A protein has these predicted regions:
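Helix-to-loop junction immediately C-terminal to a conserved catalytic motif
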Residues: 14
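ABC ATPase NBD coupling module
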Residues: 31-49, 79-80, 153, 193-196
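Conserved ABC ATPase signature
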Residues: 102-106, 110
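A short, proline-enriched helix->beta-strand linker immediately N-terminal to the Walker B motif
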Residues: 121-125
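Catalytic Walker B motif of ABC-type/P-loop ATPase nucleotide-binding domains
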Residues: 127-130
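ABC ATPase "signature
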Residues: 186-187
Length: 209
């Protein structure tokens, strides 16, 4: 399975579970899932950044500090350089005014946007989203989806697990429907999310509509 940089996609990332077979290519790193070392796994993971459904922010650090932590620790930026870049990323997700606030003072939608800015900080070849709106109140979902829409417009490669079907239809160029670890249907959003000959897919679409 190959992911071309700069194309928004929608499917499940195999290394979140132990894979049975296949080849994964992200950026310039390729991993044969039938036989790989911890070093190869680490190299592949360095090509990605994860956005969790429950934010996973450091509660004792401000929004800006959450974004700059990896820049200082891993990219060896100076604190000043990291703060300048971190503020630019927070501005990108509409949160520059909240830079000095702690997570406890932010709404769920704002926390998730900080999480997205933090993921962008490491400049990954692919952003991985695990149900990014499932922990949010309905009125906060839109602000997070809008940030992801903007990333898609900028041709950011994204791997998103979601139940937001209308959103998937808008931003994805490829959709994979999975159940119990098996791919049941895949194709363009129109092919997968419209009427289909796949009975299980039809059942799912009816249940969410």
């Amino acid at each position: 399975m190959e992911m071309s940089e700069g194309i928004p996609v929608l499917f499940f990332f195999p290394l979140l579970e132990e894979p049975d077979s296949g080849v994964i290519t992200i950026g310039e790193v390729t991993l044969d899932t039938s036989k790989y070392t911890k070093k190869e796994e680490y190299q592949l993971r360095q090509q990605t950044a994860m956005v969790f459904q429950n934010y996973n922010l450091f509660r004792n650090k401000t929004a800006l500090e959450n974004v700059t932590e990896s820049l200082v620790a891993n990219k060896k930026m100076s604190k000043k350089e990291a703060e300048t870049y971190g503020l630019a990323l927070l501005n990108r997700v509409g949160l520059s005014a909240q830079a000095k606030q702690y997570p406890v003072t932010l709404s769920g939608g704002q926390q998730q946007r900080v999480s997205i800015a933090r993921a962008l900080a490491v400049e990954p070849h692919a952003l991985l989203f695990d149900e990014p709106t499932s922990a949010l109140d309905p009125e906060l979902v839109g602000e997070v989806l809008q940030v992801i829409r903007e990333l898609a417009k900028q041709e950011t490669t994204m791997v998103i697990v979601t139940h937001e079907m209308q959103f998937a239809k808008e931003v994805a160029n490829r959709v994979v429907f999975m159940e119990d670890g098996k791919i049941l249907h895949e194709g363009t959003p129109e092919e997968v999310l419209s009427s289909t000959t796949n009975a299980r897919m039809n059942q799912f679409l009816k249940s969410i509509n």
